[in-house]
């Protein structure tokens, strides 16, 4: 029996979930796959789902889009799109004010103050008003039983907040990253006791559940908010079976050079320079890497235009067999993975850093070279994977040795070892990660009152 609720005006008795995510298809951001999978999982479990997200133009103009993802949203899901303005990324000079033209520093400071006036998030703060208005409009048309807001940006939480304050709608905070915690250095992103800190404490205190992508981030928040700890859960990203690469259970053709591959977004936190040095050394010293290729697929930086510095670095190593191939639609990922004999996992440093691609990588059954800080949370995921080759440091020699070991495994690992890799990955299917939470939310006693929830003051 699926989740049920009182009938709406059209007679539909299913629980109505409002899912809020700035980045939803056709966005190409890393978090879009979590949003897509979560929405589809709610719909498949019998919930009636409405999504609040930004207009398509937002992604087409500013961050890049993957149009193929829209076809993957289940047809019964209703998607409501809200215009989003991003002045700082506006490149059309005809839309620039005179102040921006002739006093850009003054314009940036004024824009920053405007951004955070209603919500403390540069670039995204102004979206609060249209987001809240849209959430209330959805609720007026068909009462919402549960709101699930996925951040970042954290302004997404405001839609759930306004429904809870005015109508008593319970909500889930789904942290794809963190708000106060700097996941790279473990410090604070915002001042203790400041506006963000107060706002987060208030929102956490009223949340029905709080989801985090890994145990280190959940533990950090549980220690900081012990009264909310029992409602905090890990919902790992996992891999999506419908997009997952096909496990490779046979070694590559011994007559051709090996191909190593990376798929994802390379940020400035990733040790790309260290990798290129290690790759060049490994290719000249390890026999299994003779004439080997390394392909980078995805985005160089977070925006639609590739980072010129990263692109120059990759192109400067063309003679070492390193090439950049650009973004790949999610629906074509399997074909790209089929090109590879081993995988490169490049991540930024930090105990709290994880990655969605690590689960997808594991599903391939291929050797995986972890080129990141050994204490990175991704190491917790891969520990026990039979063909995992982590570095102990990021020196040229350590990277070269790990690449050489992975190349030898790519050539000689037997079918049993590869099958064990694929079996290891099964635990990280995204539907298995989501199932316990959806089951827990299927029954929402006292979910909504006619008078609304107790209202506190915003920080």
Model-derived regions: residue spans:
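N-terminal subdomain of nucleotide-sugar transferases
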Residues: 1-87, 209, 282, 286, ...
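Conserved donor-binding/catalytic core segment of Leloir-type glycosyltransferases
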Residues: 18, 252-270, 276-279
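Membrane-proximal helix-turn-helix segments that form the acceptor-binding/catalytic region
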Residues: 37, 118, 122, 133-136, ...
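A conserved catalytic-core segment of Leloir-type glycosyltransferases
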Residues: 53-129, 139
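Acidic donor-binding loop of glycosyltransferase active sites
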Residues: 208, 319, 323, 337-352, ...
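Carbohydrate-associated surface elements
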Residues: 216, 238
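Nucleotide-activated donor-binding/catalytic signature segment of Leloir-type glycosyltransferases, i.e.
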Residues: 295-300, 305-332
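A charged, aromatic-enriched C-terminal amphipathic alpha-helix characteristic of glycosyltransferases
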Residues: 394-400, 411-442
């Amino acid at each position: 029996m699926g989740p049920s609720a009182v009938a709406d005006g059209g007679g539909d008795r299913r629980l109505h979930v409002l899912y809020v995510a700035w980045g939803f298809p056709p966005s190409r951001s890393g978090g879009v796959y979590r949003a897509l999978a979560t929405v589809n999982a709610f719909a498949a479990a019998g919930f009636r789902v409405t999504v609040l997200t930004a207009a398509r133009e937002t992604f087409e103009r500013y961050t890049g889009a993957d149009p193929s993802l829209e076809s993957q949203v289940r047809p019964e899901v209703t998607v409501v799109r809200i215009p989003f303005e991003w002045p700082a990324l506006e490149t059309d000079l005809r839309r620039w004010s005179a102040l921006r033209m002739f006093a850009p520093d003054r314009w940036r400071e004024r824009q920053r103050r405007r951004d955070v006036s209603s919500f403390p998030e540069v670039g995204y703060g102004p979206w609060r008003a249209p987001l809240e208005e849209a959430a209330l409009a959805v609720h007026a048309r068909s009462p919402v039983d549960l709101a699930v807001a996925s951040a970042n940006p954290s302004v997404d939480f405001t839609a759930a907040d306004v429904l809870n304050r005015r109508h008593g709608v319970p909500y889930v905070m789904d942290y794809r990253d963190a708000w106060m915690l700097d996941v790279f250095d473990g410090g604070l992103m915002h001042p203790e006791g400041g506006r963000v800190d107060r706002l987060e404490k208030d929102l956490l205190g009223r949340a029905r559940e709080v989801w985090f992508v890994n145990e280190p981030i959940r533990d950090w928040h549980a220690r900081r908010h012990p009264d909310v700890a029992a409602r905090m859960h890990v919902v790992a990203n996992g891999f999506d079976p419908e997009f997952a690469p096909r496990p490779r259970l046979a070694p590559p053709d011994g007559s051709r050079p090996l191909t190593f591959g990376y798929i994802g977004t390379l940020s400035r936190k990733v040790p790309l320079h260290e990798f290129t040095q290690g790759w060049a050394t490994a290719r000249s010293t390890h026999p299994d890497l003779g004439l080997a290729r390394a392909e980078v697929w995805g985005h160089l930086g977070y925006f639609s235009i590739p980072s010129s510095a990263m692109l120059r670095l990759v192109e400067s190593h063309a003679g070492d067999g390193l090439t950049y191939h650009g973004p790949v639609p999610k629906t074509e990922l399997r074909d790209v993975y089929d090109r590879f004999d081993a995988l490169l996992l490049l991540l930024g440093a930090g105990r709290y850093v994880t990655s969605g691609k690590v689960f997808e990588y594991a599903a391939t059954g291929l050797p995986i070279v972890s080129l990141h800080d050994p204490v990175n949370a991704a190491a917790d995921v891969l520990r026990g994977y039979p063909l995992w080759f982590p570095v102990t440091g990021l020196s040229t020699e350590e990277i070269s040795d790990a690449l050489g070991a992975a190349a030898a495994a790519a050539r000689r690992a037997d079918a049993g070892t590869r099958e064990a890799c694929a079996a290891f990955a099964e635990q990280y299917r995204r539907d298995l990660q989501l199932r316990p939470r959806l089951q827990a939310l299927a029954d929402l006693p006292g979910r909504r009152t006619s008078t609304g929830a107790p209202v506190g003051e915003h920080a």
